[in-house]
Amino acid sequence: MNNIHITMNNKLLTYTLSALLFVFPVHLVFIFLKNLLYDFGVLKGEKVGAKVISIGNIALGGTGKTPTTIAMANFLEKNGYNVGIVSRGHGRANISNNFLLKNQSWRECGDEVVLLKNNTSSSTRIFVSLNKVYAAKQLSKMGCNVVLLDDGFQHRKIDRDIDVVLLGPENQNKGCQFIYPYGLLREPLCYLKRADITINTKNNLIKDTGLKSDHTLDLKIKEEVLSSSSIKNIHDLASNRELFRFAL
């Protein structure tokens, strides 16, 4: 009986690996062709009627996108902008629903959206949808002149004014040299060239990212950002100057 069980497991492993060997090249070609079409203007991101700032990453795993979105939203609100946030609502019960966040429970909108709501101004509008273009257009119609895309780096269907990419300790992992499902990368590292700003997060866990860019900033966000509404502005540790002074 044990021999049969082992044989079945080996066959399952063989089938799984065979499927991955087939899927990986197809996935890689899709990423390459999609980016090529956008880079040469064959496909174009759609404008939504407001300035758009995307906060994303290039690897799987948490790099602090939501806390950074919170800090940026609060900074912009404080400086007179009407801010809207687009979130897919990861972990919510019904992912097909599209709605402006009001009094929905965490089950309806996802825990990340609740974190956004509890740590931003009451005037900041949050739209939950898988369709980022639709959500951003709705926020623009509601009077938002700046829309933040939470996790939007790979979503090129929407035109953006600023692309912010967060790099955490995950980016030092050897798995980051390979594309998912063989590694942690969502797309090859060469596509970081699309980023206007790269930010190193979780600096206490990072030795050296290897990036040598004038637009690379060391980011320090206090831990209270995850549990408190009193969020400090983000500063460049090298010069202590306030960030997010974008010409919008």
Residue ranges and their predicted role:
Residues 2-51:
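A transmembrane-helix-recognition feature enriched in membrane-embedded lipid enzymes
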Residues 3-10, 173-248:
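C-terminal accessory "lid"/substrate-recognition subdomains
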Residues 35-101, 204, 240:
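Walker A (P-loop) phosphate-binding motif
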Residues 49, 80, 123, 195, ...:
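A generic structural signal for alpha->beta connector loops
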Residues 55, 167, 217-219:
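Hydrophobic residues at beta-strand termini and immediately following loops
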Residues 81-83, 163, 214-216:
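Hydrophobic anchor at the start of a short beta-strand
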Residues 84-86, 165, 242-248:
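Conserved beta-strand elements of the Class I
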Residues 90-92, 96-208:
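Phosphate/Mg2+-binding loops and adjacent switch elements
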